[in-house]
């Protein structure tokens, strides 16, 4: 009888080309997603050495980081962005790669379009020159970010050199209370393990609460695995995953689908499989969460207060949290619900999908954005935007005073016109609250879409569980 293995072990073993004596491995890569920021040097490297893209049919390119989310018929104000966008278009054409430009309905954030096109599939290995590639693990794919030199290596060989990570299982038992979401689950996990707790691991998310999440919710959880320090995050595929992918443009069809299903149904950790570390959370005890500092581990319940760093024993950590408080312009002991906001951003590869927009629209309907807040909603892709408009969500947002934008990474990161001004405070559905992440000296609080929408209307954080 074979030894019980984890889901990660199974996918790894199925893609292992070679293992050296020192544990360095060569792994076959099934899918490669490419965007405009981390690819120019990689293509230049291919050109300089006379190489071709080894498997252009397994490569998909899209612009997302630098594109403006306003009217795209008007000139892009940033010369560097123009150059990177043009470079990707030229490289895709030269090397024979399918490419979605900023005017293509299929364009969007790379980690939104992969699943919605059926390019992301269970049991595959997926890489991209972007840290949030872990998103695709929601479908039972082994997916993680790579550096620019590795982008070149994968383009040239369809393989990647790496060492195997350890296994960690995070089991979330119980049922989530109303108003608590997948975003709150992953923020709670990061708050528990810290931003380095997952270092050297691939995380598998399991348990009743994870199974109850939609595919959008699972993508949110897997998306932020990297913020917990993990290499990747995984959820074993089930009927929800299959239903999501069925009939997608790039998903298998007919007999090929049936054959794929026979493989996919085996993609789960065996009973008795060894995990190097286990963590359990009770979903029923989770509140809506807000980050207060400059690290995703700086989490607190919306009903809580800004913590006092002086109560931290470790000196380095104490000084770090004091710095965070100063940067954020907050005082220990302040109620989270007393924190006033200047901006609200609903979107990103964490929370820019149709379910996220529906949740925000449900809160916003019939209400009005606070006069002190500038709020914007940025769909994760052209397909999401089209669906939202078909459901009338755009009208709900616009009537409530939100800006309704074109798809892209937008205010998740300060690489396009959507930026915070110095000391502006933003409730954001994105994944990182680092210093300067959304703009020079900008202050970011991470929340769920419903929490962000409620904060936009109230002008400060509110407990969405009590929203009327």
From Swiss-Prot:
Stored Pfam families: Aconitase (PF00330)
Annotated EC: 4.2.1.33
InterPro entries: 3-IsopropMal_deHydase_lsu, Acnase/IPM_dHydase_lsu_aba_1/3, Acoase/IPM_deHydtase_lsu_aba, Aconitase_4Fe-4S_BS, Aconitase_4Fe-4S_dom, IPM_dehydratase_rel_enz, IPMI_cat
Presence of the UniProt keyword 4Fe-4S in the record: yes
Free-text comment on the cofactor: Binds 1 [4Fe-4S] cluster per subunit.
SUPFAM superfamilies in UniProt: Aconitase iron-sulfur domain
Cofactor or coenzyme needed: [4Fe-4S] cluster
Biological pathway: Amino-acid biosynthesis; L-leucine biosynthesis; L-leucine from 3-methyl-2-oxobutanoate: step 2/4
Similarity-based family: Belongs to the aconitase/IPM isomerase family. LeuC type 1 subfamily.
Entry-linked PANTHER family: 3-ISOPROPYLMALATE DEHYDRATASE (PTHR43822:SF9), HOMOACONITASE, MITOCHONDRIAL-RELATED (PTHR43822)
Name the record gives this protein: 3-isopropylmalate dehydratase large subunit 2
Native organism: Bradyrhizobium diazoefficiens (strain JCM 10833 / BCRC 13528 / IAM 13628 / NBRC 14792 / USDA 110)
Gene that produces this protein: leuC2
């Amino acid at each position: 009888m074979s030894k019980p293995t984890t889901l990660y072990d199974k996918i790894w073993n199925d893609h292992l080309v070679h293992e050296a004596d020192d544990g360095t491995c060569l792994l076959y890569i099934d899918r490669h997603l490419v965007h405009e920021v981390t690819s120019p040097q990689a293509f230049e490297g291919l050109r300089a050495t006379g190489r071709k893209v080894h498997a252009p049919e397994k490569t998909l390119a899209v612009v997302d980081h630098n594109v403006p989310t306003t009217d795209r018929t008007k000139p892009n104000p940033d010369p560097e962005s123009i150059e990177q966008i043009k470079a990707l278009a030229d490289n895709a054409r030269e090397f024979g790669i399918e490419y979605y430009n900023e005017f293509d309905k299929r364009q969007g954030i790379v980690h939104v379009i992969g699943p919605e096109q059926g390019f992301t599939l269970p049991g595959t290995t997926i890489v991209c020159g972007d840290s949030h590639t872990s998103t695709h693990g929601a479908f039972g794919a082994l997916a993680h970010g790579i550096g620019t030199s590795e982008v070149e290596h994968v383009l040239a060989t369809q393989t990647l050199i790496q060492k195997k990570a350890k296994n960690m299982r995070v089991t979330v038992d119980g049922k989530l209370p109303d108003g608590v979401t997948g975003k709150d689950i992953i923020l709670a996990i990061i708050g528990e393990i810290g931003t380095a707790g997952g270092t050297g691991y691939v995380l598998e998310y399991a348990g009743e609460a994870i199974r109850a999440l939609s595919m959008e919710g699972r993508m949110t959880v897997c998306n932020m695995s990297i913020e917990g320090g993990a290499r990747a995050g995984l959820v074993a595929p089930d009927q929800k995953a299959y239903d999501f992918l069925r009939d997608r443009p790039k998903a298998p069809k007919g007999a090929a689908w049936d054959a794929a299903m026979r493989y996919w149904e085996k993609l789960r950790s065996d009973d008795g499989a060894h995990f190097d570390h286990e963590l359990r959370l009770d979903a029923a005890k989770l509140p809506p969460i807000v980050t207060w500092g400059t690290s995703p581990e700086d989490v607190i319940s919306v009903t809580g207060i800004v913590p006092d760093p002086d109560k931290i024993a470790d000196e380095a950590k104490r000084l770090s949290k004091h710095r965070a408080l100063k940067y954020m312009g907050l005082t220990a002991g302040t109620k989270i619900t007393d924190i006033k906001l200047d901006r609200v951003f609903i979107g990103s590869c964490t929370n820019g999908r149709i379910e996220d927009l529906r949740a925000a629209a449900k809160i916003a309907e019939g209400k009005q954005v606070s006069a002190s807040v500038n709020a914007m909603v940025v769909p994760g892709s052209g397909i999401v935007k089209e669906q939202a408009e078909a459901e009338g969500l755009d009208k709900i947002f616009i009537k409530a005073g939100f800006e309704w934008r074109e798809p892209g990474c937008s205010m998740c990161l300060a690489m396009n016109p959507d930026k915070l001004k110095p000391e502006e405070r933003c409730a954001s559905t994105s994944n990182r609250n680092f210093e300067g992440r959304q703009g020079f000296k900008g202050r970011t609080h991470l929340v769920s879409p419903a929490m962000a929408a409620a904060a936009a209307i109230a002008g400060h954080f509110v407990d969405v569980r009590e929203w009327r």
